[in-house]
Amino acid sequence: MQLLKDRILKDGQILGNGILKVDSFVNHQVDPALMDACGREFANRFANIGATKILTAEISGIAPALTTGLHLGLPVVYARKTKPITMPDQVYLTLAPSHTKGRMVELIVSPEYLANNEKVLIIDDFL
């Protein structure tokens, strides 16, 4: 994680109110090598928890979740912020604060991809 810390110090921007802008390597533009290193580190740290799936929120969490899933050999499910017409009527839905949007956002997951018996590892860009 030293690589991530160094990159935040080099390219991150503090915007105030607890907001750290990392658009140039995590959110808007993605550094694949950095995300791969993060995924490898997360995989090493969580290899023995028995997770069956990785869960994240669209959109910024997808890159670190995907590389973690790749290194753990696990599928990745991401919570949608809007319900597409292809999703069933019955869904898992919760509200979560979005500090960058300044409001609550819906997070929606289809039960087709997240069963009751899943052991879920949550990976996101900031927790």
Annotated model-derived regions:
Residues M1-G50:
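Active-site-facing substrate-recognition patch
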Residues V30-L34, L55, P97-G102:
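Short, flexible loop segments at the rims of nucleotide/cofactor-binding pockets, characterized by
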Residues R40-F42, A63-P64, E106-V109:
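A generic local structural motif
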Residues G50-E58:
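Short glycine-rich phosphate-binding loop at a beta-alpha junction
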Residues A63-L72:
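Short Gly/Thr/Asp-enriched flexible loops that form oxyanion-binding sites at enzyme active sites
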Residues L74-V120:
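Short, glycine/charge-rich flexible loops or terminal/linker lids adjacent to PRPP-binding catalytic cores
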Residues F126-L127:
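Acidic, divalent-metal-coordinating active-site segment for phosphoryl/phosphodiester hydrolysis
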